[in-house]
Amino acid sequence: MYATLGNHDYFINPQAITRAIEDAGITVLHDQAIPINRQFWLIGRPDNLDSHRLPTADLVRKTNPAQPVILMDHRPDHVAEHARLPIDLQVSGHVHNGQIFPANFIAQTIYRPLSYGYQAIGNGHFVVTSGYGFWGIPFRLGSQSEVWIIEVRGK
């Protein structure tokens, strides 16, 4: 299993959170592109609160262009840019689908072209989940907690 850090991880102690995640047997990708079973590439980017994170295009250049590329990027705020890169699938979160109605409409305005759900855009497929957590108060209205299971099949 693989993970990337989100904005709330940077509010606390990203190093301690990374250690805890890795102690649970999950690899945290921090500006890394790694081959998986010689079949596809997985890129993990930290949240944009990390002011030293690399541009996505630099990470994509580290992959084999003949193989599929999956990108984990916490925020969906670069979807339009990523749709022009050779990224086959991007998975993101952060927005919580607005968490409390009517904030989902605000999220749709801020995170264009995709703040929640699935959409094929440009070169790739994009998924933004509402996740299982919350921001601020532990409450949701009009947005369900969720974990997506994405099955990827080859040709």
Please place each PLM-identified region on the residue numbering:
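Soluble catalytic domains of enzymes that build or remodel membrane lipids, polysaccharides, and related
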Residues: M1-K155
